[in-house]
């Protein structure tokens, strides 16, 4: 893999820490600002909504810009939003800053994925994507627990300052190491061509799969810190360590998934999400048992991150070379799930199911995900059969013409 792909992964680690650390920081924010936990949970949804809007919007508005210029610009806006959030401890302003940082993060994500797949051959795109996404698993291993500890011992604002500092360092690295050209592209993408690429029905099924992937995860992960403290009964100091284990599982899943995604994407998606559904059901029933919960958290990270390279590989396989806007819509699709899931699973917290009930919601999303994958596989086989038939029909015509 080219070095630049690993640099992009490092950038995602810095920014992804902000996305994922809220699971552990939410209790501190809620306590500091006098909010209910479910109300503080809307910060997760706000960030996801910013990503949904920002991914296609930033992709279109920066279509003509050099990638290096756009990437650094997104990082600078992201830094400014985190500094603002740390300086003004108001829930309304914090919500606004989460939206702004998410828009910038979405733009960076979209360009990072497109840059990664453009630097490798088609049969290595899934692995390239897995390297970039591995930045998130590193964020869960190092950044998220670190953010949680900072929030617990120095205030949640300190965690935001730390994210801003890490992003600033990676922005300097991008400025130094990333070439100033567009990469392998010989001309800037055309918006009309990019829009036409979105007209494929099976592409939207793949987007649905992406949405359900993140919905399954964030239905549980958004409240995982609270589950570990209030249901499992772990001490506040142990919660960051369990989140580290989630990240370890995620890294293992990405390593395996990245190597399988290009060869057998459908099998990986079905087996991986089937495994996640089983893990979610087990968590719903055993969240009060500490050792079982810890094991299940590791498996949860491994299964959900294990399928993510295949989800992206499916989208980029359908899009082909016209992938700038389509890749951005993938980011938006993922974050529709992130936005909706905490709101849906939050509804069960006040029922007799309690916090552990969020795992049942995650399992339901996982089952729906498998249905979407089966539909995608059916449409793909029909598409391939149609393409083969057209090729076979054109060969006799070509022979007769000669």
Describe the residue ranges of each PLM region:
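Conserved MFS/SLC helix-loop-helix module at the cytosolic interface between two early adjacent transmembrane helices
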Residues: 53-92
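Structural signature of the two symmetry-related core transmembrane helices
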Residues: 69-83, 164, 267-282, 363
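Helix-loop-helix hairpin linking two adjacent transmembrane segments in secondary transporters
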Residues: 91-93, 122-179, 227
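Cytoplasmic helix-loop-helix junction between adjacent transmembrane helices
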Residues: 97-136
């Amino acid at each position: 893999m080219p070095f630049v792909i690993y640099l992009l992964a490092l950038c995602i680690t810095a920014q992804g820490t902000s996305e994922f650390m809220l699971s552990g920081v939410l209790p501190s924010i809620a306590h500091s600002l006098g909010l209910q936990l479910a109300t503080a949970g809307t910060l997760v949804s706000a960030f996801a909504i910013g990503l949904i809007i920002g991914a296609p919007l930033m992709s279109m508005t920066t279509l003509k810009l050099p990638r290096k210029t756009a990437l650094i610009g997104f990082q600078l806006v992201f830094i400014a939003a985190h500094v603002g959030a740390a300086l003004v401890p108001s829930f309304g302003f914090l919500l606004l800053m989460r939206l702004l940082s998410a828009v910038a993060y979405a733009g960076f994500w979209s360009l990072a994925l497109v840059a990664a797949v453009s630097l490798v051959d088609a049969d290595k795109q899934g692995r390239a994507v897995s390297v970039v996404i591995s930045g998130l698993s590193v964020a869960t291993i190092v950044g998220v627990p670190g953010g949680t500890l900072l929030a617990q011992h120095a205030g949640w604002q300190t965690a935001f300052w730390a994210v801003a500092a890490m992003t600033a360092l990676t922005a300097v690295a991008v400025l130094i190491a990333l070439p100033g050209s567009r990469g392998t592209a010989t001309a800037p993408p055309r918006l009309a061509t990019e829009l036409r690429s979105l007209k494929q029905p099976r592409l939207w099924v793949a987007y649905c799969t992406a949405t359900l992937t993140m919905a399954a995860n964030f239905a549980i992960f958004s409240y995982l810190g609270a589950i570990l403290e209030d249901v499992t009964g772990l001490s506040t100091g142990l919660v960051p360590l369990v989140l580290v284990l989630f990240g370890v599982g995620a890294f293992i899943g990405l390593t395996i998934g990245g190597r399988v995604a290009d060869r057998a994407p459908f099998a990986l998606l079905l087996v991986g999400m089937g495994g996640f559904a089983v893990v979610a059901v087990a968590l719903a029933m055993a969240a009060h048992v500490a050792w079982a919960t810890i094991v299940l958290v590791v498996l949860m990270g491994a299964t959900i991150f294990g399928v993510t390279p295949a989800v992206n590989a499916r989208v980029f396989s359908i899009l082909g070379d016209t992938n700038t806007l389509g890749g951005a819509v993938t980011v938006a699709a993922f974050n529709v799930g992130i936005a909706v899931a905490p709101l849906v699973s939050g509804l069960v917290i006040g029922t007799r199911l309690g916090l552990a009930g969020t795992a049942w919601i995650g399992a339901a999303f996982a089952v729906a995900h498998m249905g979407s994958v089966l539909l995608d596989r059916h449409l793909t086989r029909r598409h391939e059969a149609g393409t083969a038939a057209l090729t076979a029909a054109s060969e006799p015509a070509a022979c007769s013409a000669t």
